[in-house]
C-alpha cells in the first residue's frame, strides 16, 4: 500500500446531486462515451442516485465540426476545464503518456476522481497516479486500460481479493490475435495477414506497438501489479512480438495439435532462494488446442486466471473498439459517481507484497525449436548430447528429410530460459546446424 496516512472519509454530495463530468478527448472512444451517457442518461441516474452532467469536452482543435455536440461544451484548455468547481470526475481518453500524465495528475490534485482508458499511462506511472489519488482522497479507475469491455481489473481487485492468485495469462491484443488466427485458418504468411488486418481496420497504419508486443506488455504490467500486489511497469515485462512467426511455424503447431497465440503471462513462483517472486512476459506461445485460450479467435481477447481457491477462471469478450471500450469507461464512471453521491472511495492501489520481479532468465517453461541440420548419421545423437550437457531434457524429436538437409523439430521438457538461451547459442556454433528457424515457448493445457 502507499505510505500516505489514511485519508478522511468522503461523506458524498447526497442523493439526487448532479455529478459533473469533464471529458478529455473526443475521438472514437470519447464519442461513444458521450453517446452512451446521453442515450442512457435517465437509466444511469437511477443507478447512481443522481444525474451525470457533462461540463465540458477538451479537444485539440475546437474548430473541427462535431455533430451533436453543443459548441459551448468544447474547449482546448483541458487544465482550465478540470479546475472548474462543478467538475467531479475527469474522463481521460486522449492517448499517449506525457501530456495525459500531466492532465491526470492535475485532476487528482484538484480533488477530481479520474477514469482513464490509457494503458500506456497506467503501466508507466501507476505509482505516481495512485499516490496522488490516495493523497487527494479520490478515485482512480482504469478498467478499460486492460481489455476493453472485458471486466478483469474489478474482479481481480474485489471478487478475488480473498484468494491467492497464482497466474494471469491472456490474449490482450486484438490485432495480433486477428493476424495469428488468419495465418492459422488460411495458411497465409505474416505479411499477407497483417495487410488484411490493416485493410479491415484491425491494425494501425504503424502497427509496431501491437505486433511487437508493446501494447500487450503495458497490459501485462497492470495485470501483474494488481494480481500480485507489487508495482510492475512495462519496463519489467519481457517483450517479444509476432513479426518473426512464419507459415511454417503455424503448420508445425497444427501438426502437433497446437495453435500459436501472443500471450501476456504473469506468474508467481518460488525462486532459487526459496522465496516468492513474480515474472511478467509477452511472447508468441504454443498452446494445446484443448486450452481455453486456444479457441479465442479473430480480434477477441480473453484473460485466464488461476487462483488457489477459485481454480481456473476465464474472462472473454471484445478487447478493443469504440463501443466496447466506452462500456468499460462508463462502468468506471458509474462507480466513481456513486462514490461522489453517496460517499466513500473505491479500493486503491495495494502493493504491500513488494515481491521481487524475476529476471527473464529465471523463467521456466517448455520450448519448441525448429532447425535445419545436416542429414547424416550421428547428428541426432550429437545434438541430443548437447542438450543433455546443458541440463535440458528432450520430450520429443521429429525429423523431416529433404533433398540436401533435414528439418528437426525438438520439444523440450521444462527448462530455465537462461539454460535454453545458452543452448541455442551453442547450437548456432555447431557446423551440423545450418539454421535455427524459430524458438517458441509452450504452455500446458
Swiss-Prot record:
Task: Give the matching CDD domains.
Answer: ACT_HSDH-Hom
> Which protein, by its recorded name, is this?
Homoserine dehydrogenase
Give yes or no: UniProt keyword Amino-acid biosynthesis. Answer: yes
Q: Which residues bind NAD(+)?
A: 29, 58, 321
Query: Where does the chain bind NADP(+)?
Result: 29, 119, 201, 204, 321
Report the co-factor binding details: A sodium ion is seen in the structure; a metal ion may subtly affect the relative position of the nucleotide-binding region to influence enzyme activity, and could increase the stability of the enzyme.
Which sites bind NADPH?
26, 28-29, 119, 321
Which GO terms label this protein's molecular function in UniProt?
homoserine dehydrogenase activity; metal ion binding; NAD+ binding; NADP binding
Print the keywords alphabetically: Amino-acid biosynthesis, Metal-binding, Methionine biosynthesis, NAD, NADP, Oxidoreductase, Sodium, Threonine biosynthesis
Per the record, pH dependence is: Optimum pH is 6.0.
Q: Which domain of life is it from?
A: Bacteria
Cofactor or coenzyme needed: a metal cation
What's this chain's function?
A: Catalyzes the conversion of L-aspartate-beta-semialdehyde (L-Asa) to L-homoserine (L-Hse), the third step in the biosynthesis of threonine and methionine from aspartate.
Q: According to its UniProt record, which protein family does this protein belong to?
A: Belongs to the homoserine dehydrogenase family.
The record's Gene3D superfamilies line, in alphabetical order, gives:
3.30.70.260, Dihydrodipicolinate Reductase, domain 2, NAD(P)-binding Rossmann-like Domain
Q: What class of enzyme is it?
A: oxidoreductase
Domain ACT, which positions?
368-445
The EC number(s) attached to this protein equal 1.1.1.3
The record places the active site at 219 (proton donor)
**Which residues are involved in binding L-homoserine?**
204, 215
Q: Which pathway?
A: Amino-acid biosynthesis; L-methionine biosynthesis via de novo pathway; L-homoserine from L-aspartate: step 3/3; Amino-acid biosynthesis; L-threonine biosynthesis; L-threonine from L-aspartate: step 3/5
Q: Which reaction does it catalyse?
A: L-homoserine + NADP(+) = L-aspartate 4-semialdehyde + NADPH + H(+); L-homoserine + NAD(+) = L-aspartate 4-semialdehyde + NADH + H(+)
Q: Which residues bind Na(+)?
A: 143, 146, 148, 150
